Every structure is written in structure tokens, then in C-alpha cells.
């Protein structure tokens, strides 16, 4: 898939296809660091990569194309405990991977919160592409609980080079055209206040990610909040919703 994407976009766009760490939180942190550094226009992931991309998209503010997303990696891994080989060559030459109970538990912890940062603003900015002959992941119904746009292709779980070029690439091109990179991000608090996202930064003592944001009312004060708290949902009076919901640029500062 990686080589097909690079070939299809050669001379038009840079395609970054790093080997991901086996452990999911480490993989999330690894991809997040690349996003911070490279400022991509679009995330594309397949299977477990799509599982990770879905969690990152609304947080980093980048649309995502999810190919055959596997939202229950624990179900996939449990019957496969033991030593395996990566299917695609790894840049470090290490083709060995070991699935353990501890690894499965790491995935379980992320599965439990994987949709916590979903927001209405991204309901049409995360697209799903599902293989009609996929025998491994069948999660379109779950996808449609959170997102609105799905497509299908006559292939299996792992797309061939030809399928990537015929289906993934045209959808990626369409997303790049429909959702140009945003230079600024705005959010509305559930109590009504409007804010502008400034940046994500690390707490120097705890290494926790925090969001710096500015009020667009009153004295236009700057605020800092843990990133997880900024993006996650809250429950009030039996209703669950985003604490801060991304929106387009406000027409005024109220």
C-alpha cells in the first residue's frame, strides 16, 4: 500500500509511510510527533493504521481516510498470541513481532476510549473505505455511528497495489480538494463561549500534552487545559457531548 501511494502521488505530494511501533500507544505518540513536525494535509490508514488515524484526526485537525478500519483489535489479536512475521519489509530489518496478553491489554485500553474525541465537525471529514470481500474486519456499522461518508471497493482486507491506485488514491485526491488545510482552528464551549486553538504543548514536568487556547470574548484571555480534557466528551443530565466542539471561523467574536 505504501509504495502504491508514493508512486501515485509522485511529483504531486510527499507521502510519508513510516513503520509503526507494535505497541499502540507508542505508535500513536510516534505518528503524532510526525504530524507535529510535518503538518500533513491528510491521514490515510488501513486496518490497525485506520484504528489509530481515527483517534488522531479530530485532535490534530487533519481529515482521514480509513481503509477497512479494525475497531476491535483485541478480537483480532487474542487467537494469534505468539510469534509472527511482519508481512511487509521493515526499514530496520526486524520482521519479528510477538503478540502477548500485555499487548492485547494495551489495545483494550485504547479501544475503550477510541471514539471519545469524535466531534460533529469531523463527521464528514473522516471517510471509510470498505472492501466488499474483507473477511477480517466488519466495522462499517460502528463507523456509521460516528461518521457519515463510506465507500466500497471490490477487494479484501489488505488492498492490492492496483486497488490502492483505483480506490484509495481517487478518494484521497477528493478529500484533499474538499478539505484544504486550515491555518486556524476555532471551538465553541458547550456553555457558548468561542475560542481559538493556539497550540499543543508538553508540560515540562509531566510530559502531558496540553492545549493553549484564547477566548474570543471579553479580555481575550489565554487558557491552558489538558489535551484529553479539551477534546473529550462530557456527560451532563444524562446527555453526552463534546466539551468544546470545533467549528468554522466565527462571523464575529461573540
Predicted features along the sequence, with ranges:
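Residue in the alpha/beta-hydrolase core beta-strand immediately N-terminal to the catalytic nucleophile
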Residues: 41-44, 63-65
